[in-house]
Each structure stands twice: as C-alpha cells, then as structure tokens.
Amino acid sequence: DGKTYGDPLEQASLFAVKWEYDPKSSKSKPKFSEEIKKRTWKGTPSAKILARNHFASSLQRMSVVATVQQNEGENEQTWALVKGSPEKIATLLKSKPDGFDSQYRTLAEKGMRVIALAHKVLSPGDSKRVNDAKSPLSRDEVECDLEFAGFLAFACRVRTDSEEVINALIASSNRVMMATGDATLTALHVGNEVGIAKGGLAGAAVLELEQSNNKSGGSLRWVSAKRDKDGGIQVIGSYKDLSIPQLAQKYSLCVTGESLNAASYAATTTTESGTSSESELWDYLDSVSIFARMSPDDKERVLKRLKQQGRHTYMCGDGANDVGALKQAHVG
C-alpha cells in the first residue's frame, strides 16, 4: 500500500535520509522527488539486501549483506552493513577513530538513543559465499574489521504525563525504578526528566567494571555519572567498600546488566550442600533507581528476585524485550 511498517526508529531513519525501501525486491534507493542537498553520487545509487543477521539483544547488534552501487556506471560491490550499540560496535572496528567515545557520550547525555553504524566491502571470495549452502559466510566473518560510518541519534520524547504519574506513584509510597536496554547516560537523562532519578549526572552513582574482560569483584567500582572538568572518571569508591543503602541516600544508583551480573558472579560461593549466596547488590535491588543496558533475561531476573523478597511488583513495558519481566510481575 506504499506505507512503511515496522520499528518506529527504523521508519524515522528512512524518513530522515529520504530513502525508500521496496520489500518485494529487497532494494532501497533515494526518493528523487525530495530535494536532497549535498548529494555526492552520480545517477541513482541503490542497495539490495542479500542476507540478514537479525538483531540479538545478547549481541547488541544486527547486520545485512547487500549489493551496493554508489554511482551510475560503476560495478556493484558487496558490503557488510552493521548497526548496534556504540560500545559493542567499537569492539568490531578495524580502528576506533579519535573522538568516538566523547561524541557518543555527548549525544547520550542529551538523552539521545544512539546507534553506531559501520561497514566494510567484502572481497570477491567472501561475496560468493554469502548464500553458499556448502560454505556460507558466518556472522562473525561479516561483523569484523569494520570501518566506522557514524552515529545515528534519535530524540525519543517522553509522554507528557509520565512525570505526573510517576510522582503520584512515589507519593503513594511506591518504589519506582527503570529497567531499559538503553545506554546508561540516556537512561539517566530520561530518569531525571520523569522523576525516577534526581540530581542530574552529578547526583548519579554508576556501578561499572573497571576492566570489562575481568569478572573479579575487585574490578567493580562506583563512579560518578558526571566526568570531571578534564573529562576524566570520578571514582566514588570500590564496590566492596561501600554500603549500598548508605550510598543510595546520597546518589541515584544506576547499574547495568553487565555490572549486575558481575557483582553476582563475584560474590557467589558454592557450599558443600550445593547452595550459593549472591552479592549484597541483589539483596538491595530496591535501592537502585536505574537498570540500564539490561537484556530481557536481566529484566526478568530482577523482577523474580524482587518477588522473592516479598515485594508486590507492577511493571509497564511495551516491547518484546519486556515480555519475560512482565510475566514475572504481579501486575504487568
């Protein structure tokens, strides 16, 4: 019917770049009926999808392989086109450009939902393997040694009545928390807008892994969400040395799925009876204001633990990533 359906962010990005997509041919091209400024190509560029690697929350990315013709008369090339969370895409780049982290942080601090874009041109040999049944090109081969293409930033405005509703819930002695797959700074911005968090970035303490490849509890620390004047990290203290309830009296606490699971891993000890005990963080989940970069399983686990602690849980969620947690909640 000529209309585009699907994820609102996908639709917004197509609208913004003034391209159109034909699902029958799996081909995308510019809308020349629209005025396109600073056009750098000649003729009609196009991209046709050959294969898709669908989004996976555990991977924080998705990709397509497409034939791309940039200029009229040029031969088509086979490209790998990848998008995902900036922190994940950064690990897949051949070389991370200067300013990558600072620009991402600047956008996220404004509450933007930020997606990183990257690509590479496949070799003729790899191009032939895209749909080869005997020796197909693997996802890992597609999503590696990428060139950074840029950030895609979306302004996702909150509902006008959200703050009023949340304040009413808090006033009636309900503990209100946010669990989201969005980045920490984006979540904190929205949390402050609606009253779940207080004090801006300076008023937020974030639990982070000092070394993301190390699950040792000694690498966990609380840091301020606000950088110092030189852009450096302001460390509040070690995770092991600070009382969570006392810290929550001074800061709005924010944890990520990664740090939440690392805290659990670090403090889990197996006894002779086979039982295990988890970290203090899991005993004080209700002290946390913002759960960011949470997978569907992370959200579900938090709701399940809150119920085990005798909490009556209510959850509002509108995405497929919320289904498991909604099922765990008393009211969802």
Predicted segments with their positions:
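Short Gly/Pro-enriched turn/cap motifs at secondary-structure boundaries
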Residues: 52-57
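Conserved N-terminal boundary motif of the eukaryotic protein kinase catalytic domain
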Residues: 46-51
